[in-house]
């Protein structure tokens, strides 16, 4: 309901293209040419990494557009959506809902996000933990901003105890931003609340004028507490299977949450086509996806630590590292090819 941008890198768009969705998503989103790492206070360029050089593999898009496209294609395949069906508990093949309804299924796929009740009840008996980080998320109409080519690309500003990301969505007509900062506690019962513009401008008052302009002209602002869970030890328990943030919720520092959820779903469907034996499919899914999800989850935490350095010597080393290895770090994540990984999986 709040609207937020999402970045889809090659590891996801490769699969969306295979499903026939990529061109439609491109028509609704934006194809940024570069991602720029900058200093927080003066916007000085640290490293620029090219995107979409040879093909349209990196799409920035409004999350609502992504969901709508997927939903419409799902319904066109005679898929069914049921609302007001919160899962109460599962017993063997029977699924019970809070509305007193019941259904049966040989398999239950839980993709109910970081707050996943199914994960807590049937996998690790743990609840998400506040990460001591908060995020302000908002959108600003491009027409409200100064004439600046900055808005046409992805820009990441690295500062002490926080960072800011902004990028174009909706054919370049909106600029989506995320501003992340350390915060000791999160006392709001909900994980998201309406954002206070004065608080946001005060917290980032020492940052550069471009981001302050972006904030001040936003017509949509919400504040989120960022939560995390420990890496999971298994993705399958009997006839229960975890996908997406229910399986590997990650802090948003590598922009891979949605991408890995797409990898999960595509991988499982292809594995099931190859081998209709459900137990074998579940075994292969865990073999294929557990390590990948946990690895990116850990990398995201490390990236957050690197983004928020405050010691000037460590900042110098980080910036030097980015200048040398920035491109290869990006490629190492985006080059993952779920189609090839499935083919190479031992029988």
Q: For each predicted feature, which ranges?
A:
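Glycine-rich FAD pyrophosphate-binding loop
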Residues: 1-4
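Conserved N-terminal helical subregion
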Residues: 9-141, 184-201, 344-347
């Amino acid at each position: 309901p709040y609207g937020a941008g999402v970045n889809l890198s090659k590891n996801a768009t490769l699969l969306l293209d295979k499903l026939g969705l990529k061109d439609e998503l491109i028509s609704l989103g934006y194809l940024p040419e570069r991602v720029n790492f900058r200093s927080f206070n003066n916007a000085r360029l640290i490293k620029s990494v090219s995107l979409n050089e040879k093909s349209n593999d990196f799409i920035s898009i409004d999350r609502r557009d992504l969901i709508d496209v997927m939903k419409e294609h799902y319904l066109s395949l005679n898929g069914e959506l049921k609302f007001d069906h919160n899962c109460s508990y599962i017993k063997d093949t029977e699924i019970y809902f809070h509305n007193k309804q019941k259904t049966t299924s040989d398999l239950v796929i839980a993709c109910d996000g970081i707050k996943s009740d199914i994960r807590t009840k049937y996998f690790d008996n743990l609840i998400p933990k506040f990460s001591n980080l908060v995020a302000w998320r908002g959108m600003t109409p491009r027409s409200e901003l100064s004439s600046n080519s900055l808005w046409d690309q992805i820009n990441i500003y690295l500062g002490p105890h926080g960072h800011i990301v902004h990028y174009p969505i909706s054919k370049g007509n909106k600029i989506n931003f995320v501003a992340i900062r350390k915060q000791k506690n999160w006392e709001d019962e909900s994980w998201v609340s309406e954002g206070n513009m004065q608080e946001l401008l005060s917290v980032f008052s020492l940052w550069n004028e471009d981001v302050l302009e972006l904030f001040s002209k936003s017509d949509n602002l919400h504040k989120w507490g960022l939560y995390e869970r420990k890496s999971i030890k298994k993705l399958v328990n009997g006839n229960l299977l975890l996908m997406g943030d229910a399986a590997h919720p990650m802090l948003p520092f590598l922009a891979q949450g949605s991408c890995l959820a797409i990898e999960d779903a595509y991988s499982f469907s292809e594995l099931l086509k190859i081998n209709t034996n459900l137990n074998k499919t579940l075994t292969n899914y865990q073999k294929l996806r557990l390590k990948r999800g946990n690895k990116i989850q850990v990398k995201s935490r490390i990236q957050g630590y690197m983004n928020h350095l405050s010691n000037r010597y460590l900042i110098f080393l980080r910036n030097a590292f980015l200048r040398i290895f920035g491109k290869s770090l990006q490629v190492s994540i985006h080059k993952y090819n779920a189609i090839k990984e499935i083919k190479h999986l031992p029988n």
